[in-house]
Each structure stands twice: as structure tokens, then as C-alpha cells.
Amino acid sequence: MTDPQTEALLRRMADAMERLAPAAPVTPEFDDARLWRYDAGAGHYIAAPDYSLPLDLLVGIENQKARFVENLTRFSRGLPANHVLLWGSRGTGKSSLTKAAFMDEAGRSPALRLIEVDRDELSALPRLFDHLRNRSERFVVLCDDLSFEDGHNGLTSSAKSLKSAVEGGVLGPPDNLLFVATSNRRHLMPRGHDEAGRGLIAAAEDAEEEVSVSDRFGLWIGFPAMDQPTYLNAVRSYAERFGLKARDLDRRALQWSQARGARSGRVAWQFIRDLAGERGKHL
């Protein structure tokens, strides 16, 4: 038997642990939306509006588009498909391709849903995957800008959570779930990963852990930085689609990219938004 003070202390400890534990996911009406955001802290799914950028507007990434769409189509039809890692330069269309391809395929596959999970909430993935496992819908789970940053044991625990979710434990991976991650890094390694202070063996073990996470993605698709002709082609495609005519279009587009120090699909789209606003035209 325990004394009253010990019992009270144990109750307080149990209450504190319950507050710290992730909330159990609350199943929404998935018919209400096709895109969702998962809030792991609250255990809630938040409906999001449909993604508006058409798939055919993504130019300069034709090979990447074809590979991703083929894999997604297989998944939506219940055929074997691989989890996907989209890696490469910032602003090259990794996240846009995922959402635009999803919207395109969802028009033909009513049961398809996309759920976005924040990279800081990877610890909730195993629980989320188990929650979705027996649903009739088919889910694309997207983690944008995935990487494992140095921190107090945060790096390897996040990697292990992702691996556990993708592998599915003794139950195996969910058949109705496709995991897609975007990253600037092919092996999801933090830049300047510091071996000093932790010891070479511990640092090497961390590195092996992170590389083993990338190996869980059966399909790797790289996105190189845009060259100038591809960037201008993207600008012209956007301008033609939205009826934005300008004799000095190329010159202005190049000035825009030079001011930002980058050429990418994102920069091209930002230029078009600026041009449309200048002309008083809605996109």
C-alpha cells in the first residue's frame, strides 16, 4: 500500500504524462474535402481548399512529372507503388508537383485524399498511419521540406518515427497510404552535421540512421536548378495562360530573377503574380 502523499504524487505524474502524450486522432468526414492538414498536437484534421495550380502549368520538369504521375496513378488504382522522395533545389516545383498531380488524379479517383504533416511532428506519424490503415479512402501523406536537424536526441528519434510509420511494425505498411516527402537534401542530412562533441562513433551511427531513412523511399526524383531558357519558358507559359502580354517580358523576367538571386518555377510564378497585379488582372 502507498501513503496518501505518494498516491497524490503518482496521480499528478500520470496526469502530466497524459497531457504530454499526443492526442488520439479524431476521424473527420473525409468527404468534406480532398486536402487536409493534420495537427498532431490536437489530434485534429483541418480541411484545406483544393490546390488551384493546374498540372500542365508546371514546365521544365517533364521527366520528374511523368515519373511521379505514373507512381501516383498506380497507387490510386490499388496497384503497388513506392513512397517518394522529391529532392533538389528550392523553388523547383517539388511541393507544387505533388499537390497538382494529386488534384489531377483525384478528379478520376474520388477516394483519393491528401494529408499534409509538418516536419516537426514526425513523432505522430506511426499513430497517424495506424489510424488511417483501415479506412476505405486512399491517402497521400505529404511532409514538405523534410530534414533532420541537430538537437537533443531529436535527430535520430525523428528518423526512427518515420521509419516505424513507413514500415508499419508487425502489421506491415498500410496498403492505402503513400508517403511523399520533399527536401533540399537527398539523404535528409543536416548541413554542417557536427561530429565534434558527440564522438565519431555516435555521429556515424546518426548518419547511418538518416541514410537508412532515405532508403525507405523506393522512388527518388531529383529537381535540378533551372537554367535561363527553362526559366523563361516557365514565365512565357504562365503569361500565355493568363493573357499577360508584354513586349519586354523576357527582360523584366530576367531582372526579377537577378534581383532574387535565383531562377526557379517559384520565382517565375512570383514574377507573373507581380505582373498580373500591375495590370489589374486576377489569376
Language-model segments: what does each one mean?
Residues 2, 22-26, 224-283:
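C-terminal alpha-helical "lid" subdomain
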Residues 2-46:
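Interdomain "pre-motor" coupling segment immediately N-terminal to P-loop NTPase/helicase cores
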Residues 4-5, 43-67:
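Dynamic helix-loop-helix/coil hinge segments at AAA+ ATPase domain boundaries and subdomain interfaces
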Residues 47-49, 73-81:
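Phosphate-binding P-loop
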Residues 78-100:
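Walker A/P-loop nucleotide-binding motif
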Residues 104-139, 148-153:
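AAA+/P-loop NTPase substrate/partner-engagement loops
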Residues 148-200, 205:
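Conserved catalytic/switch belt of AAA+ P-loop NTPases
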Residues 183, 199-211, 218-230:
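Conserved AAA+ ATPase "SRH/arginine-finger" region at the nucleotide-binding site
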